């Protein structure tokens, strides 16, 4: 049966290759699919045009304005889904960086992403883009929010886990009181961890962070996100193009025995992070530190709504413009789930993807 199986696979492969070469596709996009603590990252490695730009911020704008169909095709149905997440690999624009990375979701682009950085760094070492050294291989990623240093822990040639050193994070606006339609008054903190987050203690809404409440938490998160962007102006003091609260992090009591806090991060068009969220963990640690609740080098274990964990700690204090800031490190695991050739058929009316959910939020 082994022989016949090999014969069948060989036969299929030969005929498929012959057939495929006769097909005419608009694009063949190669991706490496991964997940970090349950949250996907579909990493685009080839099949898209060169992305010009003197900075990663400019490259992100070019993608948004000229190549947005790539993002929608690979993130949305039928190839992706409402909660899909991705990373587009580009040439870096700073000499030290190994790779440039721009993060994508169903709704648009993100300037920074912890789980995605862990996924990209894992793939860079597992697939030999960066030469593996044991016990530690450094991969330097350039993102639109700055340089992210990934320390990839390698054992017997395999990646065990990744510690990323994120961009300086800071509490931006503490104690914001907001009147949110159909929710009433909500108290929140605005904190930066690579993106701007609204941090919300879910207990004030009488809600627990648990899978059964996912839909309701997403609904509440999007309402808060919309209200915050209507009422509060935010602007990163150094990176002027970061000027919106992109994510809402609702937090509560943990269920994992090692965790200090449990959260759900809501973003995009009502997407929920399955991982504890690296930039969200950074933003939360910055807020805790500013309020005297987390010391430098003290471990902070963060649990996701799916029950997976990231381990975080703050390694130094610094400044960002007029803000006191901290440098966070996040440790987590990513695994490769697939090597994909995604094709865009010129005759397919849905070739650029579709979403059912966009209209409801």
Label each PLM-derived region with a short phrase:
Residues 2-11:
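N-terminal chloroplast transit peptides
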Residues 12, 16-191, 198-361:
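A glycine-rich beta-to-alpha transition motif near the start of alpha/beta enzyme domains, typified by
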């Amino acid at each position: 049966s082994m022989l016949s199986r090999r014969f069948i696979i060989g036969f299929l492969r030969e005929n498929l290759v012959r057939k495929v070469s006769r097909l005419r596709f608009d694009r063949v996009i190669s991706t490496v699919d991964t997940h970090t603590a349950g949250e996907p990252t579909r990493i685009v490695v080839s099949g898209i045009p060169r992305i010009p730009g003197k900075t990663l911020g400019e490259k992100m704008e070019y993608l948004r304005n000229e190549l947005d169909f790539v993002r929608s095709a690979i993130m949305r149905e039928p190839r992706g889904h409402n909660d899909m997440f991705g990373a587009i690999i580009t040439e870096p624009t700073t000499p030290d960086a190994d790779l440039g990375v721009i993060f994508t979701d169903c709704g648009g682009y993100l300037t920074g992403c912890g789980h995605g950085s862990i996924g990209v760094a894992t793939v860079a070492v597992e697939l030999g883009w960066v030469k593996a050294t044991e016990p530690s291989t450094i991969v330097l990623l350039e993102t639109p929010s700055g340089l992210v240093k990934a320390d990839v822990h390698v054992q017997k040639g395999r990646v065990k886990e990744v510690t990323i050193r994120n961009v300086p994070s800071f509490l931006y606006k503490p104690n914001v009181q907001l009147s949110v339609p159909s929710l009433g008054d909500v108290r929140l903190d605005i904190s930066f961890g690579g993106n701007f987050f609204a941090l919300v203690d879910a207990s004030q809404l009488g809600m627990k962070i648990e899978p059964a409440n996912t839909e309701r938490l997403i609904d509440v998160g999007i309402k808060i996100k919309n209200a915050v962007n209507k009422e509060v102006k935010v602007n990163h003091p150094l990176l002027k193009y970061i000027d919106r609260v992109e994510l809402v992090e609702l937090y509560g009591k943990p269920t994992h025995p090692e965790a200090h806090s449990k959260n759900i991060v809501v973003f995009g068009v009502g997407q929920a992070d399955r991982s504890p969220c690296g930039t969200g963990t950074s933003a939360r640690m910055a807020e805790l530190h500013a309020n005297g609740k987390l010391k430098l080098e003290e471990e902070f274990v963060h649990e996701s709504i799916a029950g997976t964990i990231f381990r975080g700690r703050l390694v130094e204090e610094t400044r960002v413009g007029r803000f006191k800031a901290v440098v966070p490190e996040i440790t987590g695991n990513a695994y490769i789930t697939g090597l994909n050739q995604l094709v865009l058929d010129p005759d397919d009316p849905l070739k650029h993807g579709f979403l059912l959910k966009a209209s409801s939020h």
